[in-house]
């Protein structure tokens, strides 16, 4: 990049592939700005399934639920080439979650097939929203 001036990148564009970001050699992430309106009154949780021997994630799901509006947002990573935001206007059904995967390509490697990663991602999404909607808390890692 010409010059050393700070620049801004949207969170959705930051990670480009597994273990790859938009940062160039020598660049350092110095600041993350999250608007307060993006944090409250959302309730959130984090779910992760990993290969225990290696510690690599099969799937990561961050769920955000807005109790007043019933909106739901899922940040999905680990199972896809780069993280994705999946949004719903109301608590989704199992079928709606499955349909949200249309057009997404799940990773297939020595840690898990694409079908396995898709299944685990869906299970973590379902568990995350069930816990938030019922105000309970389950395990974060499986």
Regions found by a protein language model. Name each.
Residues 1-142:
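C-terminal structural segment of proteins
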């Amino acid at each position: 990049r010409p010059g050393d001036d700070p620049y801004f990148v949207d969170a959705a564009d930051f990670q480009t592939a597994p273990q790859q970001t938009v940062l160039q050699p020598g660049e350092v992430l110095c600041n993350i700005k999250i608007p307060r309106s993006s944090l409250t009154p959302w309730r959130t949780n984090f779910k992760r399934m990993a290969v225990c021997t290696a510690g690599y994630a099969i799937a990561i799901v961050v769920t955000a639920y807005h109790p007043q509006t019933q909106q739901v947002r899922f940040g999905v990573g680990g199972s896809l080439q780069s993280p994705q935001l999946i949004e719903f206007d109301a608590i989704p059904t199992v079928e709606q979650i499955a349909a949200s995967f249309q057009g997404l390509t799940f990773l297939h490697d020595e840690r898990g097939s694409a079908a396995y990663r898709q299944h685990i991602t869906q299970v973590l999404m379902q568990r995350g929203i069930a816990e938030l909607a019922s105000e309970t808390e389950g395990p974060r890692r499986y």
